[in-house]
């Protein structure tokens, strides 16, 4: 079928019931309860342990990720789903982290080791590393950098992140991307970004590249929070000299695959929804909260729905995405490859906020979807504490590429305290996951996916390009997405 794309202002805020009569609604309630029960009684934690402990870090383009993808495909098949495939994408550059070391040389009495790692998808330092005086930069506009050219040349640049990103990361992002070539042209030896998490625990800075898996043009490193504060204190007393070196492995284009498993609908098989989470993780972590929990929720939703005596009305495509961390590479490629089918995509349900106390759903700025869920949740998710709906527009994970095409998008919303504590850190391990919250979150995802797929009517229309643009502008995401290459006004 073809969707009539309508402008945002014309959307009625009333929810067209997903079921046509009381008997059908009662049957759907019963089936939703069966789906939830299957997830709650299922082996979520055991699967998460196998994914994270057996395969470890799952960086896009590495053998560890490929093995995890094959495992994910086998899990879908074991659930009785026959239509399972690996959809390959090409990442422009393969990248793997090597060793790194860094020292503070002056003005301390003896050189002191610093906590530092390369950021991802950056080239290695020159042989022997880089060493020089530190200069703090708080304004990365081209005019400010060129005005301070003499202070930047031959120096190691430490970002004053509080001021650099004072206007918000999304607004500053275009300047950030443009600044790399300017720093290189001005002769900076390298850039150092302070981490924001205590105890010198290192993670990996997000989105500092162009989101396409391309190699950054100069050495860029992340330094522990306390080490950065030490350098800033010492700079108030005089010059500070540090050095760092690291070696990364960089190859040419590499292939990496998303895992797609489809349960074909029995009434409207050409209409489909996506239930997805990313399978890849940063290499510094085993990716339990980010996003092993989400990947297992998708696997368990597939298993639970496949266990019902009949398939849903619409088809459901379960997706374990590759390449989310370096830039939504898998989901973006899927949307491009299946562009001619997108008119038939009813909704996308995504989970990439870890396993925490459930709150509800983020609906990417859509008032009509907020109204839909407020009508639906009390019927089918009563008792799951998932009754809140956020109008926040994020575009920070794999529902984003679908949302840009006006497709209704639902991102699981949970309390993110536990998630944020370990996000992209080496401490993002299985023991940080609360099993009860994990299973409850998984049941919520599975039930919403099934109810949307089983409804007599689509949960909502596709938005027009202009309506999506209105949402992005309101969220102040338009400039970021234009610079990122994801959006054309």
PLM regions with names:
Residues 27-31, 117-147, 208-288, 300-303, ...:
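Soluble metallo-hydrolase cores and metallopeptidase-like ectodomains found primarily
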Residues 220, 228, 268, 321-421, ...:
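Metal-dependent peptidase/peptidase-like ectodomains
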Residues 62, 114-219, 286, 388:
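Extracellular/luminal Protease-associated
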Residues 7-17:
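Bacterial N-terminal signal peptides
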Residues 32-40, 53-63, 132-137, 146, ...:
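Second-shell loop/turn segments in exported
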Residues 303, 307, 420-489:
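His/Asp/Glu-rich mid-to-C-terminal helical/loop segments that flank catalytic regions of hydrolases
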Residues 26-30, 41-65, 75-79, 83, ...:
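Catalytic-core environment of secreted peptidases
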Residues 24-33, 37, 49, 53-156, ...:
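Noncatalytic luminal/extracellular "stalk/propeptide" segments of secretory-pathway proteins
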């Amino acid at each position: 079928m073809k969707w009539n794309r309508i402008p945002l202002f014309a959307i009625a805020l009333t929810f067209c019931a997903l079921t046509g009569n009381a008997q059908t609604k009662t049957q759907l309630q019963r089936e939703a309860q069966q789906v939830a029960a299957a997830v709650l009684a299922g082996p979520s934690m055991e699967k998460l342990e196998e994914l994270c402990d057996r395969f470890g870090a799952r960086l896009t383009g590495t053998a560890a990720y490929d093995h995890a993808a094959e495992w994910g495909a086998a899990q879908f098949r074991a659930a009785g789903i026959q239509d399972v495939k690996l959809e390959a994408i090409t990442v422009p550059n393969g990248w793997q982290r090597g060793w790194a070391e860094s020292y503070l040389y002056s003005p301390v009495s003896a050189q002191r080791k610093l906590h530092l790692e390369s950021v991802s998808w950056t080239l290695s330092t020159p042989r022997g590393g880089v060493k020089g005086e530190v200069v703090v930069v708080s304004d990365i506009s081209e005019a400010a950098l060129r005005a301070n050219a003499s202070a930047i040349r031959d120096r190691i640049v430490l970002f004053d992140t509080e001021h650099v990103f004072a206007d918000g990361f999304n607004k500053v992002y275009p300047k950030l991307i443009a600044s790399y070539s300017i720093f290189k042209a001005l002769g900076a030896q390298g850039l150092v970004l302070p981490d924001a998490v205590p105890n010198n625990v290192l993670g990996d800075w997000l989105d500092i590249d162009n989101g396409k898996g391309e190699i950054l043009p100069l050495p860029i490193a992340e330094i522990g929070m306390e080490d950065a504060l030490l350098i800033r204190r010492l700079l108030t007393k005089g010059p500070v000299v540090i050095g760092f070196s690291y070696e990364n492995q960089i190859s040419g284009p590499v292939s990496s695959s998303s895992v797609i498993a489809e349960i074909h609908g029995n009434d409207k098989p050409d209409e489909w929804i996506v239930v997805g989470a990313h399978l890849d993780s940063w290499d510094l972590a085993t990716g339990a909260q980010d996003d092993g929990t989400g990947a297992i929720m998708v696997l368990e939703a597939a298993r639970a729905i496949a266990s019902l005596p009949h398939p849903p009305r619409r088809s459901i495509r379960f997706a374990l995405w590759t390449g989310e961390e370096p830039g939504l590479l898998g989901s973006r490629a899927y949307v491009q490859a299946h562009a001619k089918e997108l008119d038939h995509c009813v909704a996308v349900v995504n989970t990439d906020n870890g396993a925490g106390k459930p709150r509800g759903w983020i609906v990417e700025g859509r008032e009509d979807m907020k109204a839909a869920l407020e009508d639906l949740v009390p019927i089918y998710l009563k008792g799951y504490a998932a009754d809140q709906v956020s109008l926040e527009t994020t575009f920070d994970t794999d529902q984003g590429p679908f949302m840009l095409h006006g497709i209704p998008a639902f991102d699981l919303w949970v309390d993110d305290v536990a998630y944020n504590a370990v996000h992209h850190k080496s401490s993002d391990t299985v023991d940080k996951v609360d099993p009860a919250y994990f299973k409850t979150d998984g049941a919520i995802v599975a039930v919403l996916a099934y109810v949307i797929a089983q409804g007599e009517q689509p949960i909502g229309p596709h938005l027009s390009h202009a309506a999506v643009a209105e949402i992005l502008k309101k969220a102040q995401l338009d400039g970021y997405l234009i610079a990122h290459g994801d959006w054309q006004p």
